[in-house]
Amino acid sequence: MKEIVKTTNLTKRYGDICCVNNLDMSVKEGKIYGFLGPNGAGKSTTLKMLLGLVHPTAGEIDMFGQRFTEKNRISTLKNIGSLIESPSYYGHLTAKENLKIYTTILDLPDSNIDEVLKIVRLDRQGNKKTSQFSLGMKQRLGLASALLAFPKLLILDEPTNGHDPSGIQEMRELVKSLPKKYGMTVIVSSHLLSEIDQLADDIGIIANGKMRYQGALSNLHETDKNKSLEQIFLDLTGKDMSL
């Protein structure tokens, strides 16, 4: 199966601190890749390197079958949507008006606005000022902005932050529908084992900047049938990652 993202010996150091250490990642086309690890494991730093927001100390990144470089950064990023940090908006503007800023900058048709709002189930709140949005609604609007260009690859960092249990389930269903409906490949990072377990096809487990496991989630379940999935993660990471 075609690889959309491949990293080789990807490393990021800040002084003497190694946040990401010789990371080899493989994300296959049309799959949901769960990137799992405890807080501070290096997940966000890795995703920021994939988006060109942080420059690697060493290693290589291949995206869509070609080396990701400074020269092709802009053209590559046109095929990527992302929700990396809690989104912020102009509170005095409506959801549609905030998204209009993105379509103008990215030279996208305004018709995409109504379409993505419908996808994230905010179509009835499109004319509502974002200052009146809950944190969960703002996260969904952030997902809408990431979807505006209908990218080949979607990168989501802790997308269920700020959601109540029903909101978490709704966001999960939204993300799971994207590969089938729109042919997208999705990378989702989380520190919540239960969330990734219900969402991902393939999984990468990172701890202390190193990849501890990578492969099909179903294979991880088969690793040791006498152990719970939570215990397997504990063995791999040295940290409790259950809810």
Model-based region annotation:
Residues 154-158, 163:
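Catalytic Walker B motif of ABC-type/P-loop ATPase nucleotide-binding domains
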